[in-house]
């Protein structure tokens, strides 16, 4: 009876050992199979993420370009304050000259009451 039990235990140990050796011998191929399986499952999702990221990158590059262009426009406007001051001075000078012309026409109308003015203007 002890012999049968011993033989059974020896058989179990040898079977386990044989199974372990078989697994160890075939483990690299199983690992490669699992790796291939994982890549096949994951790759479409990763490709989709990559295309999404490229699309977002293009959109963000467009937005960055727009913001940089707007910033340069604002900087150009702040640098043009000198030109606006010059324009303001010229407009004030033109208004002053127009008022002088209008007042001189008014005096000439008083001097020659027989002439009718060709153009009367109203200044606000």
Swiss-Prot record:
It is found in: Lysosome membrane. Keywords: Lysosome, Membrane. GO terms for cellular component: BORC complex; lysosomal membrane. Disulfide bonds: none annotated. Coiled coil: none annotated. Disruption phenotype: Borcs8 knockout results in decreased brain and eye size, reduced muscle size, motor axon defects, anomalies of neuromuscular junctions and impaired motility. This is BLOC-1-related complex subunit 8. It comes from Danio rerio (Zebrafish).
């Amino acid at each position: 009876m002890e012999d049968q039990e011993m033989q059974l235990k020896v058989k179990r140990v040898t079977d386990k050992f044989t199974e372990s050796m078989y697994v160890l011998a075939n483990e690299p191929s199983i690992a490669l199979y699992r790796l291939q399986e994982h890549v096949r499952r994951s790759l479409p999702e990763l490709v989709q993420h990559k295309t999404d990221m490229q699309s977002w990158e293009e959109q963000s590059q467009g937005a960055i370009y727009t913001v940089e262009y707007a910033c340069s426009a604002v900087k150009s406007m702040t640098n043009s304050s000198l030109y606006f001051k010059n324009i303001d001075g010229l407009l004030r000078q033109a208004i002053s000259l127009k008022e002088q012309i209008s007042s001189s026409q008014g005096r000439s109308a008083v001097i020659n009451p027989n002439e009718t003015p060709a153009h009367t203007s109203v200044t606000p």
